[in-house]
Curated annotation (Swiss-Prot):
This is UPF0060 membrane protein SAR2425. Keywords: Cell membrane, Membrane, Transmembrane, Transmembrane helix. Belongs to the UPF0060 family. SUPFAM superfamilies: Multidrug resistance efflux transporter EmrE (SSF103481). The keyword Ubl conjugation does not apply. NCBIfam families: PRK02237.1 (NF002586). GO terms for cellular component: plasma membrane. Pfam families: UPF0060 (PF02694).
Length: 108
């Protein structure tokens, strides 16, 4: 189970990092090189997601969505210095429970 978690985290870092670089370019006036690097990192995110061991695209992306939410809240705390409120935390917990429900059962 460590490999899928590693892939989810790596994909999340690429999606959030790439998206943030594009945000900096388009919203905060950074150079187009920053945006280009963000685009390349976002492309890597799409490739990294295919390394998951789960056979179903839809299930992988649905489960990844829960991981993405948690990582986005952590990013907001570390980079934007915005602490999640109780509703953010409750929502994130609900999402992680959903991810576990999707991924943990053995399907025959």
């Amino acid at each position: 189970m460590l490999y899928p978690i590693f892939i989810f985290i790596l994909a999340g870092l690429c999606e959030i990092g790439g998206g943030y670089l594009i945000w900096l370019w388009l919203r905060e006036g950074q150079s187009s090189l920053v945006g280009l690097i963000g685009g390349v990192i976002l492309m890597l995110y799409g490739v990294i997601a295919t390394f998951q061991s789960f056979p179903s695209f839809g299930r992988v992306y649905a489960a990844y969505g829960g991981v993405f939410i948690i990582m986005s809240l952590i990013f907001a705390m570390v980079v934007d210095k915005q602490m999640p409120d109780k509703y953010d935390v409750i929502g994130a917990i609900i999402c992680i429970v959903g991810v576990l429900v999707m991924l943990l059962p053995s399907r025959a």
